[in-house]
A protein has these predicted regions:
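N-terminal amphipathic/basic-hydrophobic helices that include classical n-h-c signal peptides
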Residues: 1-20
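Hydrophobic beta-strand-centered segment that forms part of the acyl-chain substrate-binding groove
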Residues: 57-95, 99-103, 107-109, 122
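HotDog/MaoC-like acyl-thioester-processing domains
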Residues: 22-26, 59, 89-90, 101-157
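Hydrophobic residues in beta-strands and at strand termini
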Residues: 28-32, 84, 131
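Residue-level recognition of specific faces of alpha-helices
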Residues: 46-49, 74-76, 111, 128
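Hydrophobic pocket/interface hotspot
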Residues: 39, 98, 137
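Generic cytosolic/nucleocytoplasmic N-terminal low-complexity/intrinsically disordered segments
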Residues: 10-12, 32, 152
């Protein structure tokens, strides 16, 4: 059963889906260059918004992608999904909510919800990244220090 407080870090449990998760909101202002001829945010920009939210989440946990690279770990994208529900427009203030629902293994899966300032859901998405040794370019398990960071930030759903 899930603990009522923060998740306790235990490698043997990291395959389990917890009732708890990590969520983080990132605000993004739509620039004119992000829009297409129809005046909508071009679909490709949502992938960039996901990346910005991931980087912001990592920094909020006390770790940057540059820190990970210095520790010899890189995280390439393995899979991306994006579902467009409503358009966003120039100068909209978007909230990109990132959710981490599962403890990572050799891969980590992030989910995204993009809202406009009226709270309307515009887009949902998912990215799956792998953990790779930067020197050998070979897959590896999630490092213990990364699992501990995630476990320390785990919150009730």
């Amino acid at each position: 059963s899930a603990a009522s407080g923060p998740a306790v870090y235990q490698r043997k449990e990291h395959y389990r889906i917890y009732r708890t998760m990590i969520t983080h909101d990132t605000k993004i202002r739509v620039w004119y260059k992000h829009t297409d001829q129809m005046g909508f945010v071009h679909h490709s920009n949502y992938i960039c918004y996901y990346e910005e939210a991931r980087s912001d989440l990592m920094r909020s946990m006390g770790l940057s992608y540059a820190d990970m690279e210095r520790k010899g770990i890189i995280m390439p994208i393995l899979e991306v999904q994006s579902v467009y529900k409503r358009p966003a427009f120039f100068d909209d203030c978007l909230t990109v909510r990132i959710l981490l629902r599962e403890m990572p293994t050799a891969r980590i899966r992030f989910e995204y919800e993009v809202y406009n300032s009226q709270g309307e859901l515009l887009n949902t998405g998912m990215t799956q990244l792998g953990f790779i040794h930067s020197d050998t370019r070979r897959p590896c398990r999630v490092p213990d220090w990364f699992l501990k960071l995630v476990a320390d930030k785990w919150t009730e759903e």
